[in-house]
Amino acid sequence: MLKGAVTALITPFDDNGAIDEKAFCNFVEWQITQGINGVSPVGTTGESPTLTHEEHKRIIELCVEQVAKRVPVVAGAGSNSTSEAVELAKHAEKAGADAVLVVTPYYNRPNQRGLYTHFSSIAKAISIPIIIYNIPSRSVIDMAVETMRDLCRDFKNIIGVKDATGKIERASEQREKCGKDFVQLSGDDCTALGFNAHGGVGCISVSSNVAPKLCAQLHAACLCSDYKTALKLNDLLMPLNRAVFIEPSPAGIKYAAAKLGLCGTIVRSPIVPLSDTTKKIIDEALYHAGLLKE
């Protein structure tokens, strides 16, 4: 079962704005050596909205090759076009991804029947597991717990959810409707601790781009019901969890990664570089977590 800390990987770019393949592979390797439980390329944090389909597919291929089955690869395969999502999911399966992460369609605002149709089409097209990505703040729509229940009941490869609603009670509601084996991963570092207490089994994390060891330790503690240890780790990470979202992501987490020498800060427009004020707050958060030393 997929569980623990799974990094929503950033996509490093070179000075010309092209994908820095060497930096990406080195970054994935560092994540694994730091003890991360899984990686998720080409999601929101990976700047999927500004990647071409060719770049999207290439990153998945690079990630699968670098990981070499040491941890699960949960490849982003979302689109607001069902046919495009099916194409991306098929490619991820062919490339060797262990699962796909599929966001609810954004902008065109389908109803619950439309959501069911979208995800059922993808489930019929591939055999690897599907994680539903429910993030109303970005997609405008919220998948109802009942729709999720129907999808996991009707399609055995729809196995879980990345829940970025920020509502920790959702974990209990989804556990009740979808069953105890339904894989519930938080999509929000700030509320992941509480989400886990309600039945979650980990987080697809932004902060773990720079703090994979701490994040893995936090979620391991949760899985062992050691919430005293988890709370101490959460206290270390909370300023970072907040700071990297002061300005539109992933500018903040890329800046943090650059401070640790992991990649450059370049983001693709319309995301823009950070203000000096935000940089200072992120620096302070990195010191607080012990990731930067005086």
Swiss-Prot record:
Residues annotated as binding pyruvate: 45, 204
Localization per Swiss-Prot or TrEMBL: Cytoplasm
A GO term for molecular function: 4-hydroxy-tetrahydrodipicolinate synthase activity
EC number: 4.3.3.7
Gene Ontology terms describing biological process: diaminopimelate biosynthetic process; lysine biosynthetic process via diaminopimelate
Short name of any one Pfam family annotated for the protein: DHDPS
UniProt-annotated site: Part of a proton relay during catalysis, residues: 44, 107
Pathway: Amino-acid biosynthesis; L-lysine biosynthesis via DAP pathway; (S)-tetrahydrodipicolinate from L-aspartate: step 3/4
SMART domains noted in UniProt: DHDPS
Residues at the active site: 133 (proton donor/acceptor), 162 (schiff-base intermediate with substrate)
Keywords recorded for this protein, A-Z: Amino-acid biosynthesis, Cytoplasm, Diaminopimelate biosynthesis, Lyase, Lysine biosynthesis, Schiff base
Catalytic reactions on record: L-aspartate 4-semialdehyde + pyruvate = (2S,4S)-4-hydroxy-2,3,4,5-tetrahydrodipicolinate + H2O + H(+)
Record PANTHER family: 4-HYDROXY-2-OXOGLUTARATE ALDOLASE, MITOCHONDRIAL, DIHYDRODIPICOLINATE SYNTHASE
The protein's assembly and partners: Homotetramer; dimer of dimers.
Protein function: Catalyzes the condensation of (S)-aspartate-beta-semialdehyde [(S)-ASA] and pyruvate to 4-hydroxy-tetrahydrodipicolinate (HTPA).
Family according to the record: Belongs to the DapA family.
Protein name: 4-hydroxy-tetrahydrodipicolinate synthase
Organism: Bartonella henselae (strain ATCC 49882 / DSM 28221 / CCUG 30454 / Houston 1)
